[in-house]
Swiss-Prot record:
Its main location: membrane. This is CMRF35-like molecule 2. It comes from Mus musculus (Mouse). Disulfide bonds join C36-C104. The gene is Cd300e. Residues 1-17 form the signal peptide. Interacts with TYROBP. The lineage of its organism: Eukaryota, Metazoa, Chordata, Craniata, Vertebrata. GO terms for cellular component: plasma membrane. InterPro entries: CD300_family_receptors, Ig-like_dom_sf, Ig-like_fold, Ig_sub, Ig_V-set. It is a single-pass type I membrane protein. It is found in: Cell membrane. Belongs to the CD300 family. Probably acts as an activating receptor.
């Protein structure tokens, strides 16, 4: 039974090693903050913020050096808060060109093959004109004065973004299509051998 628990832990180890808000929003000329949570096992690794439709081809904007010091590249800064396993990215002086797909990523040193990927999570950045009176209900930073209907819509949209981020994660795909079938096969073999 301990073997089964150990194998199950191995299967789920990389699945949720890095999580993020899914989507954040801000105004032109303003700033926004993104916080991504990572597994404590990645403490001391370099973290970075990159832009692009895919995590494997995104262009690095700013990165840490493995310490907790804030690093800056133009209007974008990143800081690794190792004490609570959080990466904080701040984008300032926003323009509509800043809207798009970004990634929180962790630089790992044990990747040797094309099947492995750095742990990453997608974050959609929305930038709205400064004349907009309130942010749409799809933002991660809703004011509490919104009606309950907008809050329910926001919660549903955020869940969909987070679910899509999980499903597009290579760790999740490896879990579902490789580790889980292998685990189930080994579990069946154990039960079959014990039955004899």
């Amino acid at each position: 039974m301990r073997l089964c628990a150990g194998l199950l832990l191995l299967c789920f180890q990389g699945c949720l090693s890095l999580t993020g808000p899914g989507s954040v929003s801000g105004y032109v000329g303003g700033s926004l903050r993104v916080q991504c949570q990572y597994s404590p096992s990645y403490k001391g690794y370099m973290k970075y913020w990159c832009r692009g439709p895919h995590d494997t081809t995104c262009k690095t904007i700013v990165e840490t050096d493995g310490s907790e010091k804030e690093k800056r590249s133009g209007p974008v800064s990143i800081r690794d808060h190792a004490s609570n396993s959080t990466i904080t990215v701040i984008m300032e002086d926003l323009s509509e060109d800043n809207a798009g797909s970004y990634w929180c990523k962790i630089q790992t040193s044990f990747i040797w093959d094309s099947w492995s990927r750095d742990p990453s999570v997608s974050v959609r950045v929305n930038v709205f004109p400064a004349t907009t009176p309130t942010l749409p209900a799809t933002t991660a930073i809703l004011p509490l004065v919104n009606s309950g209907q907008n809050l329910r819509i926001s919660t549903n949209v955020m869940f969909i973004f987070q679910l899509w981020s999980l499903l597009s994660s290579i760790q999740f795909q490896v879990l579902v299509f490789l580790k889980l079938p292998l685990f189930l096969s080994m579990l069946c073999a154990i039960f079959w051998v014990n039955r004899l």
